[in-house]
């Protein structure tokens, strides 16, 4: 009971169409231009559902008058901004599941089909793309000049990305370049581009 009251006493919420408080389900449902603020967290979305018993918030898109999905979630914590299709966040342990997210870290554009937020500084990526060569769309019409396609990776915001198996794509076309792992350093002190491991370089010289 105490934990529940702490969340409700400190969270700010608003929506332009409806705010439904379901006391039986212990939920607050916000629809259309929904927004919540809690500590250093700001979440906006078409639909937000706050479970104040479990201290979990979920957010997703809504359909417009033409049946098109709109009002994608925007999750901001500190200086980190993520734009996913949907998100589920736990206020107690600060962990989150984030679907189809787009974000930017020090000049690197990052797209991930599933992201697990471990805490406010560590994210685990699955089936993602990383580039400094343009905007990532996530479909067949990629605008980026090139990108690295990753299966799994670890992101430290403001820092580095370490990945497992990685493929290089140029103009959305796969190249023969495949690496068992790759290291993408922070771009804060670099002009552009990546450093990737040169496998067996010493043996080739």
Give the location of each predicted region:
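Structural signature for solvent-exposed beta-strand/loop edge elements and short helix-capping sites
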Residues: 1-205
């Amino acid at each position: 009971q105490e934990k529940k009251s702490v969340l409700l006493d400190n969270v700010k919420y608003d929506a332009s169409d409806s705010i439904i408080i379901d006391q039986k389900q212990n939920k607050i449902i916000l629809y259309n231009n929904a927004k919540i603020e809690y500590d250093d967290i700001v979440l906006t979305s078409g639909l937000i559902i706050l479970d104040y018993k479990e201290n979990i918030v979920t957010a997703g898109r809504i359909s417009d008058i033409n049946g098109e999905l709109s009002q994608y979630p925007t999750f901001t914590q500190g200086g980190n901004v993520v734009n996913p299709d949907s998100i589920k966040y736990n206020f107690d342990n600060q962990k989150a599941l984030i679907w189809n997210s787009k974000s930017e870290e020090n000049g690197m554009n990052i797209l991930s089909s599933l992201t697990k937020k471990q805490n406010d500084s560590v994210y685990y990526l699955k089936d993602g793309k990383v580039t400094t060569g343009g905007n990532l769309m996530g479909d067949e019409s990629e605008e980026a000049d090139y990108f690295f396609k990753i299966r799994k990776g670890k992101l430290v915001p403001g820092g580095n990305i370490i990945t497992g198996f990685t493929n290089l794509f140029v103009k959305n076309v796969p190249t023969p370049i495949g690496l068992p792992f790759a290291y993408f350093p922070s771009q804060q002190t670099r002009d552009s581009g990546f450093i990737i491991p040169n496998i067996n370089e010493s043996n080739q010289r």
